[in-house]
């Protein structure tokens, strides 16, 4: 699974389609990621969000908004808050850690999903600091791709439900065209993350991971 989803560096041109139950809005952005400690995102649309930037370095995240012309540090428990009204937290959006390095797993059995036989696995976090202490995933055993994921708190409360859809081949990997997130602490909401373009193992200029990029 890691072989399909993870890379040393990654570039994404994508959209977040946020449905809060009353209206739908779309955010367009470009993101660059290096390992699990560095990522930078630039928001292109809509007009009111254009120029918004997010920079993650280790466990700290800075957000720059052009209408205030200042940057805000988001750290600690604030990383778990909803990002720009979506079903993703800031942590969800910026996290890119290998499953095998963050969790230990066991196979619970088989289950049919959408006419396909899947393996059901339970994953336990190796570190107490992980937001999601347990994951339950449904995996295509032949293609080794995740089809569905449930993310739980330490208490056992279901926090997030994620569906992985429309896998396609990208650089000898299978990667979903879209992921559908549902924050289970909200009602009647969902956020679809569309990957319009994704490139793996790309060269990323060092300036993208410097606070100096958080300027107008």
Please annotate each region the language model reported.
Residues 1-67:
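N-terminal mature ectodomain segment of secretory-pathway/periplasmic proteins
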Residues 12, 26-27, 103-109, 162-165, ...:
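Short structured motifs
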Residues 17, 34-36, 44-46, 59-60, ...:
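Solvent-exposed coil/turn segments that connect beta secondary-structure elements
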Residues 34-41, 81-90, 169-173, 198-207:
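Short, surface-exposed linear segments at secondary-structure transitions and domain or protein termini
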Residues 47, 80, 159-163:
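An anionic, turn-rich surface loop/hairpin at beta-sheet edges
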Residues 65-95:
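Acidic/charged, solvent-exposed loop-and-adjacent secondary-structure segments enriched in E/D, K/R, S/T
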Residues 70-73, 94, 114-211:
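Gly/Pro-enriched, hydrophobic low-complexity segments
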Residues 86-124:
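Short, conserved active-site entrance elements at the starts or edges of catalytic domains
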